C-alpha cells in the first residue's frame, strides 16, 4: 500500500549508510588485525591501506547518518518514529540537536561520531601503533554499529534503527481512527499521516542550552577512553609492554580533561534546569560517569610515575582497562532500564539488555584475561619507593581515588545486585550523606597530597630543600585559613560535630592546595606557564574542592514562609521553606522584598515565565528573575520547573517555582452579590468581613466628561481577613449624564472584587461583592543562596586548561624527539 505524504528516500539512504557503517567498521577491524599480525612490511602496508579506507568509509557513513537524521528532525517528517518521539513543530531550532541524544539511537550515533574523529586522528599520528590500536577502536565502532541496525537475525533483533517508520513502530496499533474501517486489525489508512499533526516533543528539561553542548563534550570524553585502553591492550598483544606509555600519555591527558568538563557541564545543566537546588545529587547516572573519570585520573598519575621511575606499570594497565570497562558498564546501567526508578537521567528500556551486556562482556572478559595472563611479564622494579619520593605519594593518591571509585560504583550498583541475586537491598535512608560521609575523607587526603606532591622529587627528596620550598606556601595557607575561620563559616551542623569538623579540615587543605600549587608555578618552574600544566590543573582541582565544600555546607534557604499562605507543593517540599507571592503584593524575604509582577505564556506550549522582582531593603539593588514552569506538559501530570539565578562574584541567588494555580480554575464563573449599606455597616464574605468607612463625594469633576450634574462617589472600606491581615480598598462610581459607571477595586490576596453600584449624599450605598479563585494570581517559590559557587565552575575550567596545556607540551616533546631521530 502506498501511504500519502511519506518521504521514504531519507530513511532508505539512512539504512544504506547504517549498513556501510556496520560493514566498514568490521572490515577495518579485520584489516588492522591482520596488519598487526603479518610479518612482511609489504603485506602490512596493504592491510593498513585497506584498514584506512574501511575506517574512513565507516566514518563518512556515521556523518551521513547524522546529517540525514537531522534533516528528518528539522523538516518534521513525523512518519519516522524518531522524529515523532523526540521533536515537535514548536521546538526552537537551537534545540533540534538535543533531539539526537534524547533517544538511545541518537546517543549511540553521537558516541560513534566522536570515536570516528578520534580514530582518524590516530590514523594520522599513531605510527607503528596504528594497526593494533585501530583494530580495537574499529571493533568498538562495530559494536556501536550493531546498536543502531535494527536487523533481525534468526528472530533476534539487533539494535534499534533510528530510521524506523512510525507505522512500523507499533505506536499506531491502538489507534482505530487511523485504520481502515476503524479496525486496529486492518491496515492503516493511506492518508493516516494527515492525522499526525505534531510530534511528542523534546523533554522540557532538555530544552536548555547546556543540553545542546553538554552531551557532545561528555560523549567525546566517553569515546576518548577507548584510546588509552586500546594502547594498553595493544601493548599486551604485541608484547611491547613499556613502549606504549609515551604515545598514550597525551591521550590520557585529553581524556581526563574532556570527560571531566563534560561531567561538570552536566552539573551546570542540573544547576540551571533541575529544581533540586544543586549541581550534584549522587544520582546513579552521574556516578556512572564519574567513576571512569576517577579511574582515568588514577591511571594518568601512575602512568607519570612509570614514565619517570619505572614503577606502577601494572597499576597503569589495570586503571586504563577499567576506565573503558566502566564506561561500558555505565552504558549498561543507563540504557538497560535497570535504573529507571532511581535516576532522572536513565534511558527507557528498548529491550536491548542482552546486547548491552554482551557489549560489556565482549571487551571485559578478553581484556582482563589478557592482563592477568601477562601480569608476571609486565616490567616492575623490586625496590620499594622511598617514602620521601614523589612517586610513593602519587601512588597512594591514585590508590585512594581508585578505592573511592569502587565505593561509589558499588553503592550505585545496588539495583544490579538485586536483579542478579534476587535480593532486596535498599539504599540508605539519606543517600547523599551516605556518599558524603565517605568522600569527605577522600577529599581531605587528596587535597593534602595534591598540595605537597610537586614539592617532592622522584626517587628521593632532600628534606631541607622540601621544607625550604614549602615555607611560604604553608605560611600563606595558614593566614588564609585563619582568615576564613574568623570571617567564614560552615553552617552544616545537622550531621554532627565530627562531620562538620571534617568539612573545616577539607576547606583548610583545599586552600593549602590552591596556594601551594600556585606558588610552585614560581618556585618550581620559575613562572614558565607552558611548563606548569600540572600545577595549573592542581590549582583548579583545589578550587573545585573549595567551591563544593563552601557552597554545599553554607547553602542557605532564604524563602522562609513568613506570610503563612498555604499552597499545594510537590513531594518532598517543606511548606516552611516555600514562599507564596500574590500578584502585585510585596513580600519580605530576608534582605529582599519580592513582588510577583506578572507572567507570560509561550505562544505554542503550556510554558509560563514568571516575573519576580527582587528589591534590596537597603535600596542598593533591584533586579528581576524569571523562572519558568511547565504544567501538564504533553500529558505529564504535575509541575516541571526551570530555575533562574542571579550571579554575584561571591554568591548566587537561585530560585525556582514550586506551585502555581491550577489553570483549569482560572475561569471566572462567580457573580456579584449586592448589599445596601451605610457608613459603619459590616459586610461578611467567605474569608472575613468589610466595614464601610465613609462615603465621599467629589463634585469638582470635568463637565466635559461627567456632564452638568456629574459626580464621583468614593467609598473607602476596611477589610479584615481570617488570616489576621488587614487591608484598605476604595471603590468608586461615577454618576455621568444620568448613568452609573462603576470603577471596581480588586483585593487580589483575598480573591475579592468590590463594586460601588450606587450611592447618594446621605451616605447610603449599594455595594456589589464578588469572590473568585480566578482573581487570585500567585506563585510559590523556593530560593537559595549559594556562596562562592563560582569557585567550582572556574576551577573546572582551570583544571581542564592545565591538563590540555600538559597534553600540548607532551605532543610537542614527542614530535621533537621523532624529528631528531
Segments and roles (model prediction):
Residues 1-821:
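Solvent-exposed, non-transmembrane regions of integral membrane proteins
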Amino acid at each position: 500500500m502506498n501511504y500519502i505524504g511519506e518521504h521514504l528516500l531519507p530513511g532508505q539512504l539512512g539504512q544504506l549508510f547504517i549498513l556501510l557503517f556496520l560493514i566498514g567498521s568490521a572490515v577495518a577491524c579485520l584489516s588492522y588485525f591482520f596488519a598487526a599480525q603479518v610479518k612482511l612490511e609489504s603485506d602490512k602496508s596493504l592491510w593498513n591501506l585497506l584498514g584506512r579506507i574501511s575506517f574512513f568509509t565507516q566514518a563518512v557513513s556515521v556523518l551521513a547518518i547524522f546529517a540525514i537524521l537531522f534533516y528528518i528532525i528539522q523538516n518534521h517528517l513525523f512518519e519516522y518514529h524518531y522524529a515523532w518521539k523526540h521533536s515537535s513543530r514548536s521546538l526552537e531550532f537551537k534545540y533540534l540537536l538535543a533531539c539526537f541524544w534524547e533517544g538511545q539511537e541518537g546517543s549511540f550515533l553521537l558516541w560513534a561520531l566522536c570515536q570516528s574523529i578520534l580514530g582518524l586522528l590516530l590514523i594520522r599520528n599513531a605510527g607503528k601503533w596504528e594497526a593494533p590500536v585501530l583494530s580495537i577502536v574499529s571493533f568498538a565502532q562495530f559494536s556501536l554499529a550493531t546498536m543502531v541496525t535494527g536487523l533481525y537475525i534468526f528472530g533476534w533483533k539487533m539494535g534499534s534503527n533510528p530510521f524506523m517508520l512510525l507505522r512500523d513502530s507499533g505506536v499506531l496499533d491502538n489507534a482505530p481512527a487511523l485504520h481502515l474501517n476503524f479496525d486496529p486489525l486492518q491496515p492503516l489508512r493511506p492518508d493516516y499521516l494527515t492525522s499526525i499533526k505534531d510530534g511528542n516533543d523534546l523533554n522540557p528539561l532538555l530544552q536548555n542550552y547546556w543540553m545542546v553542548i553538554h552531551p557532545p563534550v561528555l560523549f567525546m570524553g566517553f569515546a576518548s577512553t577507548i584510546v588509552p585502553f586500546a594502547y594498553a591492550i595493544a601493548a599486551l598483544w604485541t608484547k611491547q609492554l613499556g613502549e606504549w606509555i609515551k604515545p598514550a600519555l597525551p591521550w590520557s591527558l585529553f581524556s581526563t580533561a574532556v570527560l571531566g568538563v563534560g561531567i561538570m557541564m552536566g552539573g551546570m545543566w542540573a544547576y540551571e534546569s533541575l529544581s533540586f537546588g544543586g549541581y550534584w545529587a549522587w544520582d546513579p547516572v552521574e556516578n556512572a560517569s564519574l567513576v571512569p573519570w576517577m579511574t582515568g585520573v588514577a591511571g594518568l598519575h601512575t602512568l607519570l610515575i612509570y614514565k619517570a621511575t619505572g614503577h606502577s606499570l601494572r597499576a597503569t594497565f589495570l586503571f586504563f582497562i577499567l576506565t573503558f570497562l566502566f564506561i561500558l558498564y555505565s552504558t549498561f546501567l543507563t540504557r538497560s532500564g535497570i535504573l529507571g526508578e532511581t535516576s532522572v537521567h536513565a534511558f527507557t528500556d528498548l529491550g536491548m539488555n542482552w546486547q548491552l551486556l554482551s557489549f560489556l562482556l565482549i571487551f571485559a572478559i578478553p581484556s582482563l584475561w589478557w592482563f592477568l595472563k601477562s601480569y608476571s611479564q609486565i616490567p616492575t622494579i623490586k625496590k620499594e619507593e622511598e617514602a620521601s619520593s614523589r612517586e610513593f605519594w602519587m601512588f597512594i593518591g591514585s590508590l585512594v581515588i581508585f578505592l573511592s571509585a569502587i565505593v561509589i560504583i558499588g553503592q550505585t550498583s545496588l539495583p544490579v545486585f538485586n536483579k542478579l541475586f534476587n535480593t532486596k537491598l535498599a539504599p540508605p535512608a539519606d543517600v547523599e550523606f551516605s556518599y558524603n560521609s565517605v568522600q569527605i575523607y577522600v577529599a581531605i587526603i587528596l587535597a593534602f597530597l595534591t598540595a605537597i606532591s610537586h614539592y617532592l622529587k622522584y626517587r628521593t627528596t632532600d628534606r631541607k630543600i622540601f621544607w625550604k620550598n614549602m615555607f611560604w606556601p604553608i605560611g600563606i595557607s595558614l593566614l588564609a585559613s585563619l582568615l576564613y575561620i574568623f570571617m567564614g563559616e560552615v553552617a552544616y551542623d545537622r550531621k554532627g560535630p565530627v562531620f562538620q569538623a571534617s568539612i573545616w579540615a577539607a576547606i583548610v587543605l583545599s586552600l593549602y592546595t590552591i596556594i601551594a600549587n600556585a606558588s610552585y608555578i614560581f618556585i618550581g618552574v620559575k613562572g614558565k606557564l607552558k611548563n606548569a600544566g600540572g600545577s595549573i590543573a592542581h590549582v583548579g582541582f583545589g578550587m573545585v574542592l573549595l567551591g563544593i565544600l563552601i557552597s554545599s555546607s553554607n547553602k542557605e534557604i532564604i524563602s522562609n514562609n513568613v506570610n503563612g499562605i498555604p499552597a499545594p507543593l510537590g513531594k518532598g517540599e517543606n511548606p516552611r521553606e516555600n514562599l507564596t507571592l500574590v500578584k502585585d503584593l510585596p513580600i519580605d524575604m530576608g534582605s529582599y522584598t519580592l513582588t510577583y509582577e506578572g507572567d507570560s505564556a509561550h505562544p505554542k506550549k503550556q510554558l509560563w515565565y514568571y516575573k519576580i522582582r527582587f528589591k534590596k531593603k537597603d535600596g542598593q539593588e533591584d533586579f528581576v528573575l524569571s523562572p519558568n514552569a511547565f504544567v501538564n506538559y504533553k500529558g505529564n501530570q504535575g509541575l516541571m520547573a526551570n530555575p533562574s539565578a542571579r550571579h554575584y562574584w561571591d554568591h548566587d541567588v537561585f530560585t525556582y517555582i514550586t506551585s502555581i494555580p491550577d489553570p483549569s480554575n482560572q475561569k471566572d464563573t462567580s457573580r456579584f452579590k449586592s448589599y445596601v449599606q451605610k457608613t459603619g455597616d459590616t459586610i461578611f464574605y467567605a474569608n472575613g468581613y468589610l466595614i464601610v468607612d465613609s462615603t465621599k463625594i467629589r463634585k469638582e469633576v470635568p463637565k466635559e466628561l461627567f456632564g452638568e450634574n456629574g459626580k464621583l462617589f468614593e467609598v473607602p472600606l476596611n477589610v479584615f481577613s481570617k488570616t489576621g491581615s488587614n487591608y484598605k480598598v476604595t471603590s468608586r462610581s461615577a454618576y455621568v449624564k444620568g448613568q452609573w459607571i462603576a470603577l471596581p477595586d480588586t483585593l487580589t490576596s483575598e480573591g475579592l472584587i468590590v463594586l460601588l453600584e450606587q450611592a447618594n449624599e446621605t451616605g447610603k450605598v449599594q455595594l456589589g461583592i464578588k469572590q473568585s479563585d480566578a482573581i487570585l494570581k500567585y506563585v510559590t517559590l523556593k530560593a537559595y543562596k549559594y556562596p562562592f559557587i563560582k569557585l567550582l565552575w572556574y576551577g573546572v575550567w582551570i583544571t581542564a586548561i592545565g591538563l590540555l596545556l600538559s597534553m600540548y607540551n607532551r605532543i610537542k616533546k614527542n614530535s621533537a624527539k621523532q624529528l631528531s631521530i
